[in-house]
Amino acid sequence: MHDIRLIRDNPHAFDAGLARRGLAPLSAEILAADAELRALQTDIQAALARRNEASKLIGQAMAAGDKDKAEALKAEVAALKAALPAREEAERAQLAALHDRLAALPNLPADDVPDGEDEAGNVELSRWGTPRSFDFTPLEHADFAPALGLDFETAAKMSGARFAFLKGPMARLERALGQFMLDRQTIEAGYTECATPLLVRDDAAFGTTQLPKFREDLFQTTDGLWLISTSEMSLTNAVREQILAEADLPIRMTALTPCFRSEAGSAGRDTRGYIRQHQFWKVELVSITRPEDSDAELERKTRAAESILEALELPYRKMLLCAGDMGFAARKTYDLEVWLPGQNAYREISSCSNCGDFQARRMNARFRREGGKGNEFVHTLNGSGLAVGRTLVAILENYQQADGSVDIPAALLPYMGGITRLTPLG
């Protein structure tokens, strides 16, 4: 959510930020609506002040025996009172319209975010690991993983496309991945493990910006609750409508949850395999910080995600997203892309973003500095640490063997109960 005061103070900078997002200038339109709202508010305040003044004058006129003046004042008070509901309704309507207009606009990119319209404008910052040299042609996971227990056909019979039914050691491996990630993020990166609701209300989905823009990407229950598309929704909203103590910051939270996405805008993309599912597991990393700490926190968070890939010995590259490719709420984003030999390509496995105070304004999440006056909005950050299903895919493709089996990465062996390799199910 944008601060209208910043738009008033520097409309040109606001329009420049929108332009970097590929949007037309809107400051003039927004400021005109803001001026209309303030005029309505001034009119209401003036009417209330005059009503109070006239009410006092009635008593004075009565005391002076001036009945005509008293009656005229009574009529004026009655007229002011009668007109007030319409004025207040006009104010509410204008306030709602301005709120909705601002809520529909994305966050503005940070100064160090590169310009660009789409993923072609993203900047590769670094690479880690050397892709494995195979002595056979590596396959995409969709071509060999079903024999190992990644069953798409059974899932399709009961749920349709973009679902999977995992069996035996394959299911154990996915569970091991989630537990391994949680252990790393809590023990080594200092995140507090949380178990969150999987269903949230409208105001929570609005706070983390899934609503209203991404309504079509969510699943909604018949009683109006929304299935979370990421536990960012529930973790970040843990501080909504709160005033935190400065000493309590930063807050770092993590959760391993199933996530649910309709993938309404992904028709025809990744229709094979386990890359893009309606239901998937993910470890989310959320941070709540002071404004001056959020840039460093983004680096720390991204490093925590990178450490998982390195522990699993999965080659990856780090990308700085351009302004046109960032998510709606982000002011700066790093993507981590893991190497998939079966696709001969790097694919996104984690996205780590600094949202500044954009979500905090929507949630009214603030903090008070020690010895300070007034409250400030916190900064919120989120990132995947990691997407479990995509990490499973990366292991399947990078650790596949010529006979169709898959070796278990050394880091996961303590979680696998003695299983060292996935082999075709009998």
Curated annotation (Swiss-Prot):
Where primarily located?
Answer: cytoplasm
Q: What is its EC number?
A: 6.1.1.11
Single Gene Ontology MF annotation:
ATP binding
Query: Among its keywords, does the record have Glycoprotein?
Result: no
**InterPro entries, alphabetized:** aa-tRNA-synt_IIb (IPR002314), aa-tRNA-synth_II (IPR006195), aa-tRNA-synth_II/BPL/LPL (IPR045864), Ser-tRNA-ligase_type_1 (IPR002317), Ser-tRNA-synth_1_N (IPR015866), SerRS_1_N_sf (IPR042103), SerRS_core (IPR033729), tRNA-bd_arm (IPR010978)
Specify one Pfam family: Seryl_tRNA_N
The record's GO CC annotations read: cytoplasm
Which residues does ATP bind?
R261, S262, E263, E348, I349, S350, S351
| Keyword annotations of the record | Aminoacyl-tRNA synthetase, ATP-binding, Cytoplasm, Ligase, Nucleotide-binding, Protein biosynthesis
Taking the record's annotation, the residue ranges forming a coiled coil are: none
Record: residues binding L-serine: T230, S231, E232, E284, S384
Q: What class of enzyme is it?
A: ligase
Pathway linked to the protein: Aminoacyl-tRNA biosynthesis; selenocysteinyl-tRNA(Sec) biosynthesis; L-seryl-tRNA(Sec) from L-serine and tRNA(Sec): step 1/1
The protein's location, in the record's own words, is: Cytoplasm
Query: For this chain's UniProt record, which GO biological process terms are given?
Result: selenocysteine biosynthetic process; seryl-tRNA aminoacylation
Catalytic activity line of the entry: tRNA(Ser) + L-serine + ATP = L-seryl-tRNA(Ser) + AMP + diphosphate + H(+); tRNA(Sec) + L-serine + ATP = L-seryl-tRNA(Sec) + AMP + diphosphate + H(+)
How this chain assembles, per its entry, is: Homodimer. The tRNA molecule binds across the dimer.
Function, in words: Catalyzes the attachment of serine to tRNA(Ser). Is also able to aminoacylate tRNA(Sec) with serine, to form the misacylated tRNA L-seryl-tRNA(Sec), which will be further converted into selenocysteinyl-tRNA(Sec).
Domain note: Consists of two distinct domains, a catalytic core and a N-terminal extension that is involved in tRNA binding.
Q: Which family does it belong to?
A: Belongs to the class-II aminoacyl-tRNA synthetase family. Type-1 seryl-tRNA synthetase subfamily.
The name under which this protein is listed is Serine--tRNA ligase
Species in which this protein is naturally found: Sphingopyxis alaskensis (strain DSM 13593 / LMG 18877 / RB2256) (Sphingomonas alaskensis)
Q: What is the lineage of its organism?
A: Bacteria, Pseudomonadati, Pseudomonadota, Alphaproteobacteria, Sphingomonadales
Name of the gene this protein is made from: serS
